[in-house]
Amino acid sequence: MITNKIKIFLISLIFISGVYALQVDAPQYQPNVIHPGDDVDLWIKITNDNYDNEVKNIVVEVSPHYPFELRQVNPIKGKATISHLNPGESDTVYFKLHVDENAPSRDYEIDVKVSYDEINKEDGKETIHHYEITKIYYLHVYGIASFEINGNFSLIPSKTQTVPIEIINTGTGTAKEVNLYIGYSLNSVNAGSESVEVSAYGTTKTQEKTIYYPTAVPISNLPISPVGETKFYLGALKPDNSRVINLKLYTASNLVEGCYQIPAVITWIDEDGTKRAEQITIGAYVKGDILLGISNVVTDPKEIKPGTTYVRIDVTITNNGHAEAKDVKLKLITNKPFKDSWSNCNIKDVGNLLPGVSKTVSFYVDVDKYASAKHYKLPIEISYLDTANNKYKTEKFIDIYVKPKPLFEIITKEVNVTAGKENTVYITIKNVGSEKAERVKISAIRNSGQPFDYPIKSDTIGTLYPNQTGTGVIVIDVDKNAESKPYIITIEIRCAGDSDEGDNNVYVYQEPLKVVVNNSNSKSYWILGIIVVIAIVLVVGYVFKRKNSKDKE
């Protein structure tokens, strides 16, 4: 394609003579470089080349093709007239055109038709000859590049991600030497201005042109910033062509969910050689993540031991993410040796948690008295909805330490005592707990409703290690009228914790002991004696009767 020149094709329609009296010059126009959307001033010079004859009734018609449109309407749209031209005389006609804004780069046709009458005077006689000339001219329109950036991606705070973006030339001209700067601003340095006088067929225009040098300047501390490469060379981009590049971006940790703009600068050279630059932005959607964490686990009492009931466990749930968590629910799942202190006491409805917000909830558990001393991982089930009402469920664990303590079991299942006397009773106990017991002491607790007194009701056993047994002695004085039957008395076991482990607590337990009373004077013994006598009489009578029967035979 030939640029900056006009290609002229002459198509002539000769009606009367093959010799033209008029010369039609190539059109002159402003601006010299035509772009889509421009208004173009067009001048056409007509000269009477016949130095013998006058020409009259000159009509110049312009018929533009796409993308040109006539704007000149006086006196008739697209038509200009010259009344006459003497031999050698010339005149200029003026037209105004508009270029369609979406015209791509190429040469476009303009048809110029000139009709006139030539006056031929010979031998005093005037003869009129009519002529029509059609010429085709091509004006070049330089398209202008324009850019659009597409990137369908989302980012997550505190993360570095590689995302693709597409750069599209949506303009009408080819862009050369295209460069893309990510995380830059456009700083145009004004270098002054210049005045340019443009003349065409005696018409002079003065144009003021500002001179500036576009410069891409990097921006620091961006909420979304490029990592590594920030400048990308794309080469030439024709209209409707595109390039895809991969950006590595870091998203700041303090960003909340929403839309953000990444500044960028794109530079290129248009088809007419003009250097251009544009400040653009890349739209990015930061999708906040939801990170629910459990912290600040506090128990009451602070020291949890086997057999403790109504232990309160306070936990703090925090949304460490960047998006709101909705309808948050917590459920403490208890397994042996733990159980809920009451129904539904360990299901908590927290509600909504905004980013960075915390809430504290309380759970209540009972600890089995035979629980082993160790660390336990109690699961907490967390359910919630995200901003799009999608359901999620996760599980966190809290650490609960059950400390050791002594625990006792009476090995002696029952003792036999005699009514009306003092009975020395040996009671064996075992430390079935997980901690050494110091200063172990047993005591019988007197019950006024029972026929017992305790001349010696207590005895010190000493120290018992876990799984070790010890025996203590008490004396039970049984009332002489006590009935012969089993009784259940209460034995109190008192001890101190393991001082070597810093446990100075005093532990008190009460365990039952079966005491069987034997009383020969009691009504039960009389009844038993009568039954025995009757049984003996019956047996003797039966034997005697059989013996007499045999003697008679």
Swiss-Prot record:
A GO CC term assigned to this protein in UniProt: plasma membrane
Name assigned to this protein: Uncharacterized protein MJ1561
Membrane topology summary: Multi-pass membrane protein
Organism: Methanocaldococcus jannaschii (strain ATCC 43067 / DSM 2661 / JAL-1 / JCM 10045 / NBRC 100440) (Methanococcus jannaschii)
Keywords: Cell membrane, Membrane, Transmembrane, Transmembrane helix
Keyword Membrane: yes
Keyword match Transmembrane: yes
Subcellular location per the Swiss-Prot or TrEMBL entry: Cell membrane
Taxonomy, superkingdom: Archaea
Segments passing through the bilayer: 6-26, 524-544
